[in-house]
Swiss-Prot record:
Cofactor-binding details, from the entry: Binds 2 heme b groups non-covalently.
Annotated a ubiquinone binding sites: H192
Keywords from the UniProt entry: Electron transport, Heme, Iron, Membrane, Metal-binding, Mitochondrion, Mitochondrion inner membrane, Respiratory chain, Transmembrane, Transmembrane helix, Transport, Ubiquinone
GO terms, biological process: mitochondrial electron transport, ubiquinol to cytochrome c
Chief location: mitochondrion
Record-linked CDD domains: Cytochrome_b_N
Protein name, per record: Cytochrome b
Cofactor(s) for this UniProt protein: heme b
GO cellular component terms listed in the entry, alphabetical order: mitochondrial inner membrane
UniProt subcellular location: Mitochondrion inner membrane
Disulphide bridges, residue numbers: none
Amino acid sequence: MNYYSINLAKAHLLNYPCPLNINFLWNYGFLLGIIFFIQILTGVFLASRYTPEISYAYYSIQHILRELWSGWCFRYMHATGASLVFLLTYLHILRGLNYSYLYLPLSWISGLIIFALFIVTAFIGYVLPWGQMSYWGATVITNLLSSIPVLVIWLCGGYTVSDPTIKRFFVLHFILPFVALCIVFIHIFFLHLHGSTNPLGYDTALKIPFYPNLLSLDVKGFNNIFILFLLQSIFGIIPLSHPDNAILVNTYVTPIQIVPEWYFLPFYAMLKTIPSKTAGLLIVLASLQLLFLLAEQRSLTTIIQFKMTFGAREYSVPMIWFMCSFYALLWIGCQLPQDIFILYGRLFIISFFSSGLFALVHYKRTHYDYSSQANIKITRLR
């Protein structure tokens, strides 16, 4: 029975029908899976030599870097892999916003759950080196979460970031990637259940098998991203690292500016430009909820016809503003909290939510035309 199941899965993967006109934008999911696997592999090796205790955490990282054979390589590959995971995730979501992936709500929602787990896992992992920036970043974020009763005390093991905090963060950082891996398999199952989308946004009978045609496209993309991954891990990770995080924690000295990793900057800009910490936290949660709400603009009984592409002008304009506002918040997040950047941040927060809600409401109101879909079916039958 097991042998039959393996053969059935193998035949499905080899003969999986894919649209003829998909391009390199459909390569990001495969690349995400490869980089995520490298993250888990390097993370397991690093966890075997890491000591989750505030007196030894920083020195265990230095031991891995300086004394362990190839330890620096594993540590830098793990740090670079985190950036690549979020870069590919943002590109993957961007492709989904442009090319009708929202019309597969199960795949879209499961993918966003994976994205949320990535955010939590990356933040927890950022605290583990126990550098100056790690400690103060954890202090700021946990203070923001203090508006939720009992959560901070349960998460930190007390009222401040201390030894129980780093122990709990280490355990969560080790477990959450495997939880995300389980949801990745569910995400792939839903994708294969409905089939892949294509740039035109409508179902087509012109399909080709995954092997060897599209597998060669995935291998080509993997070669390109792996070269970038190695170059960044070996040569580019030190210049991009924040120097304050290479300093042992000093609880009496605050850094000039608390700067998280670049993939947190849009959410950090929302927190930084809103004076109330509770309101800032609600806005961050609302920004994630807005992505979930976009999955509501679909109808499983209709055929997708050139929807959610840049050709649909009444849809593309607010969606372009939605994406541009997100990347503007990314830039504002790395700036000093001056009045001009706070003003720009609030304006782009308004633009982010208004354009996203306008795209949701306007597109849902104007594109549920069941009669036109019926006419398309009749025309095809003729």
